[in-house]
Each structure stands twice: as C-alpha cells, then as structure tokens.
C-alpha cells in the first residue's frame, strides 16, 4: 500500500522526521518498502495567472502570453501547451528557476518572441508522467505563492507491505492508529457530519445471501454533475497513493477506500430495474464487466443484481450495464460488508485482483459502513452537487463477525515476552489499541476492536503488547532454563535402530502421503471404512490411510515405470482407523511397513538371477523381530488377508496377539495396481514391539552339546512353527536348540502329509548328559508331538 506522509500527518503528527517515522512503522510490523519524494527537486516555480494569450506570429503551435506572478510587471512567456488560455492559473518557472535534471530557466527568444520563463506541466516538475498540457490550478490559487508550498510538494510517498492479518492498515486510518498508539498521541479523525436526507427517493434492497453479505447499505443521490472536475487536492492525494484520477464519482469512492479502507461502488440508478438483490450467481450466468470483458459466473460467486440481471460481482468488480457514465445524473451508492470467505478466490478465478477484493478477502471493519457512506455522500455532494436520500441499511446481526473477548494472564505475558511490563502500562497499551479492557487479579479481559480480525487468542494480545511496548525496549537477558534429563529405559527399542538395520539390508526409507486414493485403498482393504477428508487436495488424495501399503505400493509402481525393477523400501508412520472408542473417533497407530520386489541380488556375473520370495522377506522381518529379543515368542500363522496371496502369506502373532502381516501381494491386486512381477509386503504395529526383552547374562555350559535328529510325519495343515514350539516347551530344561532342516513330501509319505526333519540340541550347564537322559528327552518330545498333532516317526 502507498500513501502520502502528509496525509498521514493530518491524522497524527508525531514530532519525528520522515526517516524515523518510516523506521517506526517498520518496527510496528508494517514493513516500509520505500520512501520517495512526491515531486522532483526544483525551486523558483510560483503560481501565476495568464492575463493575455495570443497566437505566436511565427509558429502555429505556440502562443505568446503575458503572465502575472505577483511582481511589478507582467512576464512575456511563450508556451506551446494546447490548454493554455486567458484567465488560467498556472505553475510558472521564473528566470533563475532550476527544474528537475538541473534544467535552468533563462531569458530567451522563441521564433523571435521573448520568453521570460516557462509554464510548467506535471512531468516537467517531476510530479507525474502527465505531459499533455500545463498544470491547471484552481481559480483561487494565490498568485506569487511558491508552487511547492501551494501543492504541498515537500511530501513523501511511503510504500508498506501489509501482511494478510493487518487488513485494517489498508487505509490511512489503520496506519494512523498504529502511529498514534506508538507515539501516545490522539488520533485526529476528519469530522464526518451525517448528511441529512433532502429527498425521499430509495430503491428496494433484498439480501438473499446473508452469510456472504451480513450488511448492505444503499443510498440514492439525485441530480449530480458527473462532469464536475475533481478538486486538485483530491487528485494529488490519490496520485500520491498510486491511484489515477478518472472522474469525480469514482475519485470519491477511491478516496474513501484509501482513507477509511472501505470499498464502495456507485451504480447508475436509472439503469437499475426494480431494485437491488444481493444473491449468489446462477450457474453459468454472465456479466459484462466495466473493462468490457465478459465473465461466466459460478454458483458460489456473490453478485449484486437488479430484478432482471446481475449488475456487479459483489466486492470484486462492477458491471458495464450499471456503471456511471457521462450521462449519469442519479446514482446509488453502495457500501457493504462482505464475508471474506465469500470473496476469497473468486477474483483470481476470473484473472482479477482489485483494490476492493484485496480488502474484502482480508476483512473490512464491519462497523465502518455508516461512517464511509456519510463521508462519501458529503464529498460527492460538495463536488458534484445533488440531493441525498435516506440510507437503507439491511443488516443480519447473526452473521456479522463478533468481537473476540480474550483473557490475558500476567504469567503468560511475562513468560512469552521474558520481561515484566507494569500493569498500568499493559492496560494503557490495550486501551490505546482500541480494546475494551477490564482489569482483574493478574489478568486482563479485553474485547478486541471491530477492525482487528487478527485479535482472537491470548498470544495475539501478548504480541500487541510487545509490539507497542517496543521490541528494542525489551532488554537482552540470558536464557535461564533447567535441563531435565530424558529418561531412558534399557528395554526401549529405538525405531532408528530398526531403520538402520533395514538400511543395512538394502532397504531405502520413503515417506508417503497420509491421504490416499480411496478407490485404491478399497482394493487393498475391501469393506473397511476410512476417514474421508471434507476438503481434499484432490479426489486421489481424499481418504486417510488405513495402512502404509497404499502409499508403498504406489511408490513401487512409480519406480517400476521408471525402469527400477529391483525395489526395497520401507516406511514408518501413522495409520488412521475409525474407532468409536478412540478420542475424536479415530485411532492413530504407528506402523512399520516394507515392500520388496525384483531380483534377490543386484546384477552380478557370479550370482544367478533369482526373484525374491516369501522367505526373503520373512528372513528380513525375523532380523527386525530379533532386535526385540522376542523372536522365540513370535508365531507366523496362516491367516487370510484380502490384499495377500492366500498360500504365501501369514499373520504375525506375539504372545497370542496379532501384530502384523507378511506375504506376497494377491495376484488380482497386482494386476489392478499394474505391479510388475511378484511383490511382497509386511506391516507391523510398532508400539507392540518397542518394548524389547533385555538380554540376561547366563552361564555358558562347559559341557558338550548333543544333537539328535528326528523325522516326524504330520498332516499338511500342521504349521512347522507349532511343532518346533512344542519341542521347546517339552524339553525346556535340556533342549537348548530346535531347528527344522528338511521338509519332505513324496514316496513313503502319504498324500496330505509331510515329513519334517528336526534337529534337537541338548545340553546341561552342570554336567555331561548321559545317553539314557538324552534318549528320554527325545522320546518325551516325540510322545508330545504324537499326542498333540498325531505325529508319527518316519521309518
């Protein structure tokens, strides 16, 4: 935002120079991007009056004038400007004047006629780029007055970056409030006297979208002269704020916009049919904008319409069919509060970014509309004449923003600032900021001013107090903090340790999105309800994941499509499972999952190309589980999972509780996901593994170990893991090792049965076992297997 320093000083005039003022504004949070003089460096230019103006005898495009500059005689000056005429008050550079660019004015002859000065344009004085003619001053401009003094050109344009939370500073009044607070000065607001209605003319106004437009004010002004010139003082203020003068009506609404931060619009009343209706656009409805372009509107766009057509995009841009033109005599002034959410994004959708939409998107003071309407009415009547009707106010109090009531605690204030500010000073700062303050014991109750949308929570008040108090006034103090040593249990298994193990085994860690494609997720978890996002980034990212497999398998496909056929990846992260018993109805579990596919080894001349299988992944998984010290308590059980191959998968159980799955991706799912070749996955509930068994030191036996091998025939559906577990249980005191070293099916073994060759390692820590003891233990194991599994020794 750009504004004139002198305009700001009309509201509040601290006794500091321009540099100090700019620095103060920056430190208040409104970063100053630049300070530039409003005019070039010149002197010797005064107000003059063209007393005579005649055609140059030797040049068609030149005129010979006599100009009164308040001296003893009239000056002869040759001028080429087309708007030079008798009686005009002008800016005259007299002999000896120096204009921008070190251009010195001297007496000269132009085509034989003497010239004792120069009638200046705005561009020649470095005020603007306008070189279409000489400056036309008001008829009451005092002759002989220095033009710098008359036009107040010893001024600067200050440009600031206004952050989105400080929409109140998109008007002079907002910046002035901050400067007044920082310098403990009163705010001198211009006197705005309500304009009484002198006519009864009104237009019916209906608001059909109160959520988008909680307040709408309209006022008819009849009999205006739209061709009346905008006063030079107003043109100059607009120019110094970067706004080009258009006509008196538009200039008035722009002036109020810059002064108060309230956008306004003027409709040609005679082109409105019936009355005003504030509604949402009809899908596909069109509107020809003021710049001549046609906009196709969506149903979520707010429009100002009459009883037959849309007239304007509410809070964004006016329409051509209701705009003010040279023939306009009667206008309807609009001043409204539009909800920021109803404006946000609508302008960009049509390639627009207007001063009005910029302010409405960030928030306009909902208590400002009556003041702005009265200000605009007075300025319009003073410049263009006319008579005003009554103000029609349609307000829906239920949808207007409510002023936040915030409690500021002394303890919170001191802790966040790190410095004690006296109670009286805190109260004074909050009141000067516009808050209604009630003091309590070690706290303040503050009602935020209507123009501060960013004051919502306690931290906002802490920030405001620190900002106004002055960050430079807060002394530097060394941080005093007690160091609390984190507790570390030896039984805690670090997830980082597991990640390192997987890295060592050739896996790479990936991070995928927590929100996934619900269609793909349903393929992996059919029939399981997932949490759907109300405002997703896209349809493909609209559901919270039920497992890490969805993202991991998508990553595999992505890599395979880029000629990466050997993939080993893992991920740790949360899954989100709907659960009515959990807080907020969602259970978040930390999971560890991985995927492998492709060749078992990297390509090598001495290694055969072998594709990974179930046992490759199971072996890697057992290495992970071994870190917990509970591998002997882990069971792999055949259990159905719709995402996995029914004959090459298993559920993982720890002490009878399921903690995950491992297996080959189901062939049908592989086809649907476009996976290239056999793909294997695993997933574990990490929280059920993080508590590891601390290794216990035990005596190493000095006595020899004995191995005995047995081959038992069992039914095909008996898991080998159950056989090994039973052997360990029976020989708990002497059997120190059990291993499956062969599985046989075929000749000598009946159909539907298998032969398991098992090695038993027997050892005692106190003595050498006798053969009879060994035989008895082996027999005991065989007997237990017969009893539980109907196993028989193979002949």
From Swiss-Prot:
PROSITE patterns: B5, FDX_ACB, TRBD. CDD domains: PheRS_beta_core (cd00769), tRNA_bind_bactPheRS (cd02796). Binds 2 magnesium ions per tetramer. Its main location: cytoplasm. InterPro entries: aa-tRNA-synth_II/BPL/LPL (IPR045864), B3/B4_tRNA-bd (IPR005146), DNA-bd_dom_put_sf (IPR009061), Fdx_antiC-bd (IPR005121), Fdx_antiC-bd_sf (IPR036690), NA-bd_OB-fold (IPR012340), Phe-tRNA-ligase_IIc_bsu (IPR045060), Phe-tRNA-ligase_IIc_bsu_bact (IPR004532). The keyword Aminoacyl-tRNA synthetase applies. This is Phenylalanine--tRNA ligase beta subunit. It comes from Shigella sonnei (strain Ss046).
